[in-house]
């Protein structure tokens, strides 16, 4: 069939070229539609279930909210694991599904299970699923702030919207904001009701998260003394507000043949109307809200805050829908924010702080630069070694054509163009088959012209092209098949490594398949069309000189093979020993151009105190000349996609381009050290320096933010915490450990209110009445809403902040007694019904698959991940004795490394088996198959030496490089063996066949090795964004091809000579024995 394809491609060459052009146009269109991202999205399929329970402790949340939800989810088909976190007033259950699951269907299933679980949950608890987004979802951050944060520098015009001469801020609706809370509440209102609704309509945006400021509320602050004097309870106050603030419909009336809709609208529209609401009557005199309480515009008791460059702001985050194009979505969000900025109230601005498209563009620029430079190097080698620009052009055209055809397949397989899928393309590797056919066609045409002594006729030329293509079709087909086969097992990668490398492998296989088809169709057709004139009879000087130098060594290797074979064995032995000195890591860290400084304080730190710590930290870091801006997110945002306690902050450090860094500062590590120096004097913080995407990936995949985590499982939280502290002490002594920390699970100060049930009964009250009074005064009680157009704001009854924190005021809080006939309503102070106690409680309870756990996390610097964990595990086993029933597991990036290493132990042998099977099909001789397979270990040896020389650890990226170089080495060996066998078929003696076959294949072997290795050179030496991820793969391929080429040209002929001589000695009719 293949020979028919070759003949047809030459016969109908113009049709083939026309169809190729059509496919190229379609490919160009598909390439333009290709989604672009930084890296493949390695986040597992998961759903986050968030529940807000403001009045519960962590243990209560675990028992009454988290556990029932976990129980409801258990047994759901497709669930792989669960993990949960219970904090003060908040629960999050993360459900992780199998990769084969349909996320939208699973969300529906989770929703049904939650509906079944609601009867088992406390009243008013409404579990909510997080947005349909991933670890790469936060594509755009922006800050909503005042153009002049404190009014300094603003143009002041009293009475007009903006800053006023008295220091207040006048809104466009006439509200005067004269305190910090109201001004921050106004910024949050702009974010929630102007920016967010418009931004959510942007294509590809799943949702928009808001953090910082205060959600605006109309706060009713009771005067407890006046309430007691008037005999008004908190329940009376709430009921009055609810009864006053309503709207009803009363159908319609007919009048003069027309229908009139009847409306009874008594909704409250302002704070003044709240103050005038009547609560009750005393001696026929109405008592209003304003007589017993102060009404003001305030904010919620917030759980999160944000700031930028030392000033409090509101930060918004655009979350990308799963599967969307991050570059397109981020650019669309930026464009939309520019439009929204024109509609903002005077004095308020939007400041973009993090734009993912900038990182995407920088990364793709690196990839494109490497691909273009690699392609140019490949073309240059083709021109130099072929000595015919037409032939070189034919081979070079396969490069863009294979890329365009691959783009069609990438879209069909939903693979984005990113650092891994496009960055690993080596056009030299891809066009090896085309190069072999072009080189052989060029050689045969030159020989035929020389024999005929004239230019060939059309029929002669076409006949020669078909014959030359047929001659090389066997090594080409099987050679390409070998390269294809070595990548096939990589598709069995699972988990994170599967998500990271499967797109790369599929893209490579698409490119190889495209180039293979083109080499059988387009290349013969182009050779027939373009190589019409006289073809040079001599080879280029470089090849001639190389052959002259090579022949004596080749003859020596065939005559005396053992020294050459011994050198090959020694090389492999040395490489095996050297590999033990190569470090290990899961993946090289992508330089995201920015940094993230995670700050954790003692558990009792309030959200306001966290902000007070963040503001000077931002100013200190901002003083570094290489830093462009610093913004912080403390606590939990509205969607709780990344929930943190009030004592934790994420400080995003946006760096300037490296060209603007000060002299002497050239690396990220230096910047991190300078940041540590700035933050060192700030006591009370525990820092962890990572990068934004890296941090989110680590957290979403493994539940931790750092490189390494030691997870300690057990039941007793006190024992878990104590064991974790001992493990942390060991980790801190382990070389390479940085940012070691243990989340503080206990030590959260608790103010307990203990009910005196006997006293409550004596006063004729119930526990619920007392509890409701406490809850309303402390936490606040919603009492309706005020509508302002589309906006709606809660009316909340709550004590003023200073009174909520004053024990004397709380003790005197009046609890209204039941009404007695004929008597004024009396009250009793709260202190006579309860007792106050200060204790310490739990800060957080974390669980994995229903098992409680505490983790110790650390980053690794100055050494590779694998050796660090080996060292730390040995120290922990020696120095830390685990209590009965307790065990530990390693998590974070090391967990991914472990899983990938186990998978590689299966993949690598499978690759060798597939290579051997393919070779045997091509050669038909077990001995010669084994001979060609010796190319693999020497190719691997070169990769090991290259890693060691460059100080690059072994990673999954390097492993893929080892697999790739094995295929190229085998391809070159197959090309050489095919030439040797051809001469044996012609009746040559074994030694002569080996020598002449090897001499004939010097040029194709050198060409395939050079184009494959030089295509990777730009990746190996690149310094742009994302280059660090490509370097291990490129380094291994280049180093491996150096040793593999030496093997092919020296050791392989030496081995082949021995094998052929023995076969000849065993069978006089050697020729027949060596046939396929």
Curated annotation (Swiss-Prot):
Signal peptide: none
Entry keyword set: Cell inner membrane, Cell membrane, Cobalt, Membrane, Nickel, Plasmid, Transmembrane, Transmembrane helix, Transport
Membrane spanning residue stretches: 14-34, 366-386, 390-410, 418-438, 475-495, 502-522, 561-581, 903-923, 928-948, 959-979, 1003-1023, 1035-1055
Molecular-function GO terms, alphabetical: monoatomic cation transmembrane transporter activity; xenobiotic transmembrane transporter activity
Record membrane topology: Multi-pass membrane protein
InterPro entries linked: AcrB_DN_DC_subdom, Acrflvin-R, CusA-like
The gene coding this protein: cnrA
Entry-linked Gene3D superfamilies: Multidrug efflux transporter AcrB pore domain, Multidrug efflux transporter AcrB pore domain like, Multidrug efflux transporter AcrB TolC docking domain, DN and DC subdomains, Multidrug efflux transporter AcrB transmembrane domain
Organism placement in taxonomy: Bacteria, Pseudomonadati, Pseudomonadota, Betaproteobacteria, Burkholderiales
Protein name: Nickel and cobalt resistance protein CnrA
Subcellular location: Cell inner membrane
Pfam families attached to this UniProt entry: ACR_tran
Family of this protein: Belongs to the resistance-nodulation-cell division (RND) (TC 2.A.6) family.
Gene source species: Cupriavidus metallidurans (strain ATCC 43123 / DSM 2839 / NBRC 102507 / CH34) (Ralstonia metallidurans)
Stretches assigned to coiled coil: none
Chief localization: membrane
UniProt function note: The products of the genes cnrA, cnrB, and cnrC are likely to form a membrane-bound protein complex catalyzing an energy-dependent efflux of Ni(2+) and Co(2+). The mechanism of action of the CnrCBA complex may be that of a proton/cation antiporter.
Induction behaviour: By nickel.
